Amino acid sequence: MSGPNGDLGTPVEAGAEGEEDGFGEAEYAAINSMLDQINSCLDHLEEKNDHLHARLQELLESNRQTRLEFQQQLGETPSDASP
């Protein structure tokens, strides 16, 4: 697959027959596989980010409600009740 620096591990010869652009089928397949792995990782990160965002929104709303309840118990008027 790839080395620690992202190298494909197979050097491409400039004068290879049938490879005018310098890349063969194996190199394209390796790059495609790496891109698929990166895409999967990014999808996973996006899902985790969405989940964390939803949980933080819930926590924020819960904290607002708790603060309002404490203010009402103390007989104070809420100074920042708007979201």
UniProtKB/Swiss-Prot annotation:
InterPro entries registered for this protein in UniProt: BBLN_eukaryota
Cellular component annotations (GO), alphabetically ordered: anchoring junction; cell junction; cytoplasm; intermediate filament; kinetochore microtubule; subapical part of cell
Any one GO molecular-function label of the UniProt entry: molecular adaptor activity
Compartment(s) of residence: Cell junction; Cytoplasm, Cytoskeleton
Main localization of the protein described in the UniProt heading: other
Stretches assigned to coiled coil: 25-74
Cross-referenced Pfam families: UPF0184
Swiss-Prot/TrEMBL keywords: Cell junction, Coiled coil, Cytoplasm, Cytoskeleton, Phosphoprotein
Modified residues (Phosphoserine): S82
Any one biological process term the GO annotation gives: multinuclear osteoclast differentiation
Region of interest: Disordered: 1-25
Organism domain of life: Eukaryota
Function: Essential for intermediate filament organization in intestinal cells, interacts with intermediate filament and regulates intestinal lumen morphology.
Family: Belongs to the UPF0184 (EST00098) family.
Protein name per the record: Bublin coiled-coil protein
Lineage of source species: Eukaryota, Metazoa, Chordata, Craniata, Vertebrata
